């Protein structure tokens, strides 16, 4: 288990003498090695140890105050925030969150691994419940739009967040097996804020620090969650109505673009026309509109 107390003491980027660090560690060399294995750079100069650059860890107490009455469960190092919510859902209320600095087994869409450098992203999952009689088609679009509105970036159907045509973040929605008469969901969100140069991601990616060099996760996180919950409450009342369709289209990275839709049956080309009241994608193919739902469908610009 990683020594988070030691990391917290090192996080300010100031040199720390070995004898001080040994108050927090029974085996300093082993603990330092574990920190390095998750991508942290710790310099050693004689008896002095220094973590570079400074690591701006989240302050869970301040976040809890900003998001009252929701409970914030701060798990600095965790396998998966979605998994934590799923395992603890019986003791949670709607809107309660799990927030992490680092995930060892984060998941993305279609079971892909979600890579998370330490304290370089906003990573959280929360519990939400819907009336089972109401449709939640288009839910991931609602989440994506809420994030795009706060960050002033773009969405790509069905659930990618883009800046400058590069992926800034992703969304994972899972159904929870919790028998309380509601449709129970775990919603996970990961957003790149400031990644180290050593981060190995196989596709072009963007970071919030490109948009706002002074960004602080501490203030951005509650702002995102508050707006997200506002959008979810509107969605519960109105669904994917005309107002939402227009708002989503205004942030759509592929609006009226020539695209290829990659399906299990093959590639379909056309011009993207936005979404309908179910959140389905509308594509003009020749003189006919074809509809696509999420599932195993991907989009590419031509």
Swiss-Prot record:
Chain residues forming the annotated DNA-binding region: 14-33
Range of residues in the leader sequence: none
GO cellular component terms given for this protein: cytoplasm
Biological processes per GO annotation: protein modification process; regulation of DNA-templated transcription
GO molecular function (one): ATP binding
InterPro entries named among the record's database cross-references: aa-tRNA-synth_II/BPL/LPL, Bifunct_BirA, Biotin_CoA_COase_ligase, Biotin_operon_repress_HTH, BPL_C, BPL_LPL_catalytic, Transcriptional_repressor_C
Keywords assigned by UniProt, alphabetized: ATP-binding, Biotin, DNA-binding, Ligase, Nucleotide-binding, Repressor, Transcription, Transcription regulation
Positions that bind biotin: 80-82, 103, 107-109, 167
Reactions this protein catalyses: biotin + L-lysyl-[protein] + ATP = N(6)-biotinyl-L-lysyl-[protein] + AMP + diphosphate + H(+)
Keyword DNA-binding among record annotations: yes
Pfam families tied to this protein: BPL_C, BPL_LplA_LipB
EC number: 6.3.4.15
Enzymatic class: ligase
Protein family per UniProt: Belongs to the biotin--protein ligase family.
HAMAP family per the UniProt record, alphabetical: Bifunct_BirA
Protein name, UniProt field: Bifunctional ligase/repressor BirA
Organism, scientific name: Haemophilus influenzae (strain ATCC 51907 / DSM 11121 / KW20 / Rd)
Gene name for this UniProt entry: birA
